[in-house]
Curated annotation (Swiss-Prot):
Record's protein name: Major immediate early protein
InterPro entries reported for this sequence: Znf_C3HC4_RING-type (IPR018957), Znf_RING (IPR001841), Znf_RING/FYVE/PHD (IPR013083), Znf_RING_CS (IPR017907)
UniProt-listed GO biological process terms: DNA replication; viral DNA genome replication
Zn finger intervals (RING-type): 86-139
Pfam families the UniProt entry points to: zf-C3HC4 (PF00097)
Location within or outside the cell: Host nucleus
Swiss-Prot/TrEMBL keywords: DNA replication, DNA-binding, Early protein, Host nucleus, Metal-binding, Transcription, Transcription regulation, Viral DNA replication, Zinc, Zinc-finger
The species this protein was found in: Autographa californica nuclear polyhedrosis virus (AcMNPV)
Region (Leucine-zipper): 228-249
Membrane spanning stretches: none
Length: 321
């Protein structure tokens, strides 16, 4: 068989990154981008939540301070003293404070009734299906009641509701308690409201500064992400180029080995077949295809050119008579 004796001095072949390495590097870059994006979104959401929470607290503090100021002004006003006689039970009530008056007036007329009689009217109407509450004096239908209070009018409406029977006095106390809770929000440490507001303002300023810093960091991360995306694009182009080269090199590596083996007609047929099989296996063990491909890489290493490689090896074995 012909042998190549010019391939004695070989240099190290040029090593290129494999497709698997490029894919792994690309996946690592994408995972890094996704992790940075998630961390950035979580930090921004946390900062926005803290800023909103501080703003709500400041608004609540402002409302509480305003309500306290209004209640203080109301308490400092002179007490209005007057007497009132209920038109139903004829009991006389005297007003000696600026709290909610203990009597109600229908919104449809000007007749006043004590709170106890109004609750009795509502209770009687609730016990009768499809009944309405009317003024006992003018028989005008009453849908809502109003309670007089200095500088304010409180309007209330009764609804039918299944519940345990509560004495009218207790109902009156419960409603007064609800009105007081709605009119004034309880505040702890009233003397330190100003200090708390200043502290909240300082915290908000610090959070805004931190938010600005996070935005700058976000811009930097976005710039790094763009660089990583460009790097990924470049790696994708390299992968496509290598895939194209692989598709181009695959047909070029085809090596045709034609083996022509004679036979001795005088020998038994099984001996001829055994000889032919051993020759085929010996030729395949010579690695002719791999050797030619190694020579091709050595010659064209480091260049984009690639020569076609089509080698025909003819092996003739004659039999001596």
């Amino acid at each position: 068989m012909p042998r190549d004796t010019n391939n004695r001095h070989r240099s190290t072949p040029y090593e290129r990154p494999t497709l698997e390495d490029l894919r792994r590097q690309l996946q690592d870059n994408l995972d890094s981008i996704n992790r940075r994006d998630r961390m950035q979104e979580e930090q921004e959401e946390n900062l926005r939540y803290q800023v909103r929470r501080r703003q709500r607290q400041n608004q609540l503090r402002s409302i509480q301070m305003e309500q306290q100021r209004m209640m203080a002004e109301l308490n400092n006003e002179p007490v209005i003293n007057f007497k009132f006689e209920c038109s139903v039970c004829l009991e006389t009530y005297s007003q000696q404070s600026n709290d909610t008056c203990p009597f109600l007036i229908p919104t449809t007329c000007d007749h006043g009734f004590c709170f106890k009689c109004v609750i009795n009217l509502q209770s009687n109407a609730m016990n009768i299906p499809h009944s309405t509450v009317c003024c006992p004096l003018c028989n005008t239908q009453v849908k809502m009641w109003r309670s007089l209070k200095p500088n304010a009018v409180v309007t209330c409406k009764f609804y039918k509701k299944t519940q345990e029977r509560v004495p009218p006095v207790q109902q009156y106390k419960n409603i007064i308690k609800v009105l007081q809770e709605r009119s004034v929000i309880s505040v702890e440490d009233n003397d330190n409201n100003c200090d708390i507001n200043m502290e909240n303002q300082a915290k908000i300023a610090a959070l805004e500064a931190e938010l600005e810093e996070e935005k700058n960091h976000s811009d930097q991360v976005a710039s790094e992400n763009r660089q990583l995306i460009e790097e990924n694009t470049r790696l994708n182009e390299q992968i496509q180029e290598l895939q194209h080269q692989v598709r181009t090199l695959v047909p070029q590596r085809g090596i045709t080995v034609n083996q022509q083996i004679g036979r001795d007609d005088s020998a038994p047929a099984e001996l001829n077949e055994r000889f032919r099989s051993l020759v085929y296996s010996t030729i395949s063990e010579l690695f002719i295809e791999n050797g030619v491909h190694s020579i091709q890489n050595y010659v064209y290493a480091g260049t984009s050119a690639a020569s076609s490689c089509d080698v025909n090896v003819t092996v003739n074995f004659g039999f001596e008579n």
